[in-house]
C-alpha cells in the first residue's frame, strides 16, 4: 500500500468533516506494537527507508513534524487538525490515502489520532529509517579460545552449546568418502580407492582425500561446470544461440575452473568481459517486443547484482521494489554502465522522461564516471565489484558454497544477502579467509569439508522445521541430475561418446597436461603431395600393434578428407563424412590384450583432384593408470586397391607401402587445432564425456536441470511427481540402463560377482546378508542381459543410491 501526500495546495477540514472523523482510541497507544506495523505496511514504500515522495518522510519524528511539499502534516495534540489524519480517514473522497491498496479502517484511524493527541511518542531504536546495509564491509571475526583446532568448529562450539546440539559423532569413513567424492568431483568413489581410504590409519586421511580430489582438475571442472552454467545462464543450445542473440562462455568457464582461476579475477572477467566471456553480460536478445526490464543491459544489471552481490533487482527493473529498498533509479543506474547511450527510465512500460544516472548499486565501493566511454565505465564497474572493500562479493560466494555442501545457506535465501546470517561470525570468517588466500575457491571448499560441522551425520529436512533455524548438521541432499546420470554411467562403464553437438570450447586456455592433451598424430595419405592435390578415390590403411592388457578406455579421435570408415579387429568402430568435424569415441570394448589391428578406409570424394588426408589418434588407459598412444604416422601401411579381406586382422599387409606423412594436425589446408578446442575433442582423452557436457534430456529436466534462460542459483531439493515418473517409467533412463546392461552382460564377469560389485560401487559398502540374497536372486536369470538390467534397476532406485547422506 502506498501513502503519497499530494503536491497541490490543501484545504482544511470543515467542522462538519471533523465531526465525521473516527474517534481516537481511549487507551495509551504503543508505537512499537500498534503504530509502527500500521505505517510500515502502508506508508514506508514512499515515505520511509530513504524515500520521500512529495518531500514527506516519516523516518524520524523530526522529519514527520517537518512535513512535506504542501506544508506540515501533523499538529501534535490536535489530530483533528492534522493533514495526515485527513488523508487516511477518507472523509474527503477526493483526497484519500493510500491511493493504492487497502484503506485505513476506522479503528486504525483512531490509533493514529490517539498517537498524535498523546504527543507523537516513539520508542528508542524503532523508526522507519533505511536499515544499515548488512554483509557489505569486510570483517575478520575474533576466534574464541582455546587456540588450535579447526576455525569453523571453534566458532560453532558456543553456537552448538547454546542450542543444545549434540556433535559427539561424525559420519563413518565410507559415508564421508562418498559425500566428498560427490561434492568435489561429482562421481562415485571407485571401490578400490574407497577400501584403501577406509583401511588407511593416517589421522589426516580425510583432509588428504579432500585435497587430492580437489586437485583432480578435469573431474573438478566437469562437475562444477553444471553449477556455474546454472548461475551464469550458459548452455549449449536454446533461445538465442541460432540467431546470434546469445553467446556461449563454455570454453572460458571450463578453463577457469580447470585452472582454478582466482574468484576475484573470475568475476572481473565476467563483468569486464574478454572475447570468450562476453556471453554473460551480452545476455539474451529476445525476439520481438520485450519489456524494458528484459533488455540486455538490464539483464546485465540484474545478474551482476544477484550473482555476485546477492541483491534482487528484478522488481526494481520495472518499478520501485515492494520487497526491498531498491528503486527503479538504482536498477537503471547500473544498467546504464552497459548502455551505448543514456537510458530513459521506463516504469511499468511507461517512459518517465527521466534520464538515468550511472553508478554501482553501492557507490561507496567505487565511482563510475558517467561521462566516460562504455569500455571505461565497464572497467570501473568491474573494479568496484572486485574491490577489496567489497566484503559482499566473498560473502555471497562462500554462502553459496556452504549451501551447496550443507544443504542450506548461512544466509537464506542465498540471493538475499542483505538478510542476517544465522552465524555472522562464521560467514565473516569464510569470506575473509577466502579473500586472504588469493580468492582460491578450493581453499574455501577444503576449509568447509574438513570441518567437523561438514562431517556431522546428515539431518532430514523435516527435522529442520523449527520456527527459528538451528544448524544441526548437513541436510540430506538429492544427487543432482548430472550426478545421477554420471553415477549410472560409472556403474555400467557406458559413457557418452561425445559432448553436446554445439558445445564450444574456444577460450579454454587449458594448461597442457596429459589429461587434456591429445596424441600428436600426423595427417597421412598414400602420396606425399596429398595435402595439395590427390586423385579422387579411396586409400586403405592398416595398423597392427600390441597392448599389454585390455584397456580401461580407448579414446579415438579421427578426421579424414573427405570420409572414413574405421574398424577395430574387424568390428564396427566409427565413421565420418566431414573432415571439419573431428569424430571421437571410446572404443575400449573393441580392443583386447595382445595384438590388435585398426583399419581405415578413407575416401577423397569428388570428380577432380583435391587435398586428401587421414588424421587419427588413440589414447589407451589401463587399470594401473598407465597410458599408451597410437597415432597416424609413417608406420601405417597403405594401399589404393580394395582387396578382398584387407580389413581382417589376419590379412598379410607385408607388401603394402608405408604411408606418407603430410604434417601435424594444424597443417594446411585443414588447420584443425582450433576446431579441436572449439568442439572439445581434446577432452575425450580422459575416458568419458560427462552429463555436464550434454544437452538436457527429459530425464535431467525432470531431475532438476533448469532452463538456463534464467539465473538459477539453487535447484529444488524436494522430490516431485515428474521425477518419480522419469525414474520409474521414463524412456531416457530405461534406455541408459538397457544399454549399460548390454555392455556389462558382454563381459566375462560372473553375474553374482558383478551384482555385488555394482552394489558396492553404488552405495560405498558391501551388501548385507539379506541384500546379498536379493542380488543372487536377480543374478540367477537365464538371460544375462535381462538379469543385469534388473540388478541395475534395483540398485538405481534405492534412496541410499540417489541421496547424499
Residue ranges and their predicted role:
Residues 12, 20, 63-88, 99-109, ...:
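Electron-transfer interface patches adjacent to heme c in soluble/periplasmic c-type cytochromes
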Residues 25-48, 145-183, 545, 554-560:
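Mature N-terminal segment immediately following signal peptide/propeptide cleavage
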Residues 26, 45, 51-56, 70, ...:
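Axial heme c-ligation environment in periplasmic c-type cytochrome domains
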Residues 29-31, 97-124, 375-378, 447:
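C-terminal capping alpha-helices of c-type cytochrome domains
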Residues 37-48, 56-59, 82-89, 110-117, ...:
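C-type cytochrome heme c attachment motif
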Residues 58, 95, 113, 124-365, ...:
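Short, structured secondary-structure elements
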Residues 509-531, 597-682:
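An acidic-aromatic loop/edge-strand motif
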Residues 545-568, 598-600, 656:
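Aromatic-lined ligand-binding clefts that engage carbohydrates, nucleic acids, or primary amines
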Amino acid at each position: 500500500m502506498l501513502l503519497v501526500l499530494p503536491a497541490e495546495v490543501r484545504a482544511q477540514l470543515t467542522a462538519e468533516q471533523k465531526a465525521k472523523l473516527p474517534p481516537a482510541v481511549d487507551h495509551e497507544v504503543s508505537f512499537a506494537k500498534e503504530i509502527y506495523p500500521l505505517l510500515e505496511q502502508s506508508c514506508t514504500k514512499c515515505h520511509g527507508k530513504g524515500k520521500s515522495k512529495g518531500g514527506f518522510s516519516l523516518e524520524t519524528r523530526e522529519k514527520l513534524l517537518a512535513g512535506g511539499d504542501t506544508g506540515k502534516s501533523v499538529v501534535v495534540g490536535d489530530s483533528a487538525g492534522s493533514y495526515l489524519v485527513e488523508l487516511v480517514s477518507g472523509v474527503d473522497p477526493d483526497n484519500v490515502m493510500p491511493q493504492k491498496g487497502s484503506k485505513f479502517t476506522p479503528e486504525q484511524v483512531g490509533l493514529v489520532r490517539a498517537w498524535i493527541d498523546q504527543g507523537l511518542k516513539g520508542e528508542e531504536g524503532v523508526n522507519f529509517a533505511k536499515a544499515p546495509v548488512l554483509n557489505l564491509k569486510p570483517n575478520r571475526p575474533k576466534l574464541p579460545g582455546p587456540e588450535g583446532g579447526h576455525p569453523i568448529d571453534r566458532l560453532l562450539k558456543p553456537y552448538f552449546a547454546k542450542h543444545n546440539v549434540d556433535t559427539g559423532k561424525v559420519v563413518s569413513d565410507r559415508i564421508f568418502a562418498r559425500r566428498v567424492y560427490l561434492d568435489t568431483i561429482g562421481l562415485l568413489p571407485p571401490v578400490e580407492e574407497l577400501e584403501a581410504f577406509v583401511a588407511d590409519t593416517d589421522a589426516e586421511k580425510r583432509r588428504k582425500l579432500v585435497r587430492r580430489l580437489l586437485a583432480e582438475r578435469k573431474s573438478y571442472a566437469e562437475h562444477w561446470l553444471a553449477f556455474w552454467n546454472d548461475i551464469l545462464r550458459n548452455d549449449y543450445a536454446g533461445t538465442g544461440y541460432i540467431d546470434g542473440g546469445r553467446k556461449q562462455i563454455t570454453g572460458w568457464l571450463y578453463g577457469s575452473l580447470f585452472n582454478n582461476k582466482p574468484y576475484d579475477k573470475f568475476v572481473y572477467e565476467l563483468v569486464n568481459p574478454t572475447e570468450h566471456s562476453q556471453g554473460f553480460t551480452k545476455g539474451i536478445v529476445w525476439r520481438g517486443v520485450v519489456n524494458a526490464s528484459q533488455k540486455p543491459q538490464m539483464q546485465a544489471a540484474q545478474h551482476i547484482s544477484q550473482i555476485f552481490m546477492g541483491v534482487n533487482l528484478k522488481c526494481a527493473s520495472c518499478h520501485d521494489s515492494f520487497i526491498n529498498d531498491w528503486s527503479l533509479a538504482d536498477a537503471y543506474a547500473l544498467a546504464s554502465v552497459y548502455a551505448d547511450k543514456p537510458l530513459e527510465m521506463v516504469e511499468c512500460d511507461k517512459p518517465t522522461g527521466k534520464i538515468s544516472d550511472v553508478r554501482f548499486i553501492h557507490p561507496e565501493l567505487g565511482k563510475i564516471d558517467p561521462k566516460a566511454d562504455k569500455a571505461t565505465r565497464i572497467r570501473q564497474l568491474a573494479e568496484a565489484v572486485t574491490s577489496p572493500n567489497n566484503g559482499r562479493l566473498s560473502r555471497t560466494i562462500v554462502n553459496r558454497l556452504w549451501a551447496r555442501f550443507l544443504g542450506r545457506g548461512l544466509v537464506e535465501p542465498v540471493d538475499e544477502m542483505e538478510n542476517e546470517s544465522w552465524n555472522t561470525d562464521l560467514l565473516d570468517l569464510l569470506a575473509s579467509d577466502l579473500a586472504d588466500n588469493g580468492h582460491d575457491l578450493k581453499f574455501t571448499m577444503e576449509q568447509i569439508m574438513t570441518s567437523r560441522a561438514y562431517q556431522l551425520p546428515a539431518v532430514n529436512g523435516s527435522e529442520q522445521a523449527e520456527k527459528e533455524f538451528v544448524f544441526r548438521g548437513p541436510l540430506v541432499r538429492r544427487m543432482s541430475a548430472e550426478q545421477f546420470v554420471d553415477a549410472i554411467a560409472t556403474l555400467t562403464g557406458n559413457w557418452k561418446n561425445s559432448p553436446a553437438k554445439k558445445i564450444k570450447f574456444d577460450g579454454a586456455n587449458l594448461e597442457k597436461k596429459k589429461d587434456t592433451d591429445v596424441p600428436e598424430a600426423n595427417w597421412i595419405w598414400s602420396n606425399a603431395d596429398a595435402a595439395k592435390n590427390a586423385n579422387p578415390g579411396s586409400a586403405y590403411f592398416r595398423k597392427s600393434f600390441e597392448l599389454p592388457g585390455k584397456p580401461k578406455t580407448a579414446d579415438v579421435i579421427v578426421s579424414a578428407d573427405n570420409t572414413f570408415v574405421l574398424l577395430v579387429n574387424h568390428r564396427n568402430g566409427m565413421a565420418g563424412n566431414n573432415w571439419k568435424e573431428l569424430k571421437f569415441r571410446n572404443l575400449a570394448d573393441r580392443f583386447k590384450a595382445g595384438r590388435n589391428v585398426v583399419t581405415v578406409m578413407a575416401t577423397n570424394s569428388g570428380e577432380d583432384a583435391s587435398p586428401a588426408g587421414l588424421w587419427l589418434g588413440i589414447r589407451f588407459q589401463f587399470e594401473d593408470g598407465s597410458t599408451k598412444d597410437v597415432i597416424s604416422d609413417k608406420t601405417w601401411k597403405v594401399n589404393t586397391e580394395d582387396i578382398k579381406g584387407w580389413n581382417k586382422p589376419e590379412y598379410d599387409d607385408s607388401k603394402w607401402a608405408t604411408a606418407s606423412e603430410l604434417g601435424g594436425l594444424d597443417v594446411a589446408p585443414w588447420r584443425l587445432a582450433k576446431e579441436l578446442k572449439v568442439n572439445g575433442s581434446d577432452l575425450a582423452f580422459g575416458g568419458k564425456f560427462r552429463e555436464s557436457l550434454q544437452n538436457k534430456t527429459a530425464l535431467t529436466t525432470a531431475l532438476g536441470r533448469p532452463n538456463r534462460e534464467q539465473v538459477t542459483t539453487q535447484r529444488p531439493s524436494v522430490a516431485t511427481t515428474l521425477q518419480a515418473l522419469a525414474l520409474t517409467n521414463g524412456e531416457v533412463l530405461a534406455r541408459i540402463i538397457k544399454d549399460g546392461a548390454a555392455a556389462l552382460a558382454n563381459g566375462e564377469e560372473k553375474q553374482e560377482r558383478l551384482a555385488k560389485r555394482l552394489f558396492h560401487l553404488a552405495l560405498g559398502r558391501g551388501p548385507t546378508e539379506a541384500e546379498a540374497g536379493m542380488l543372487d536372486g536377480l543374478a540367477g536369470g537365464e538371460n544375462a542381459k535381462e538379469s543385469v538390467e534388473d540388478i541395475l534397476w534395483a540398485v538405481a532406485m534405492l534412496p541410499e543410491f540417489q541421496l547424499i547422506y
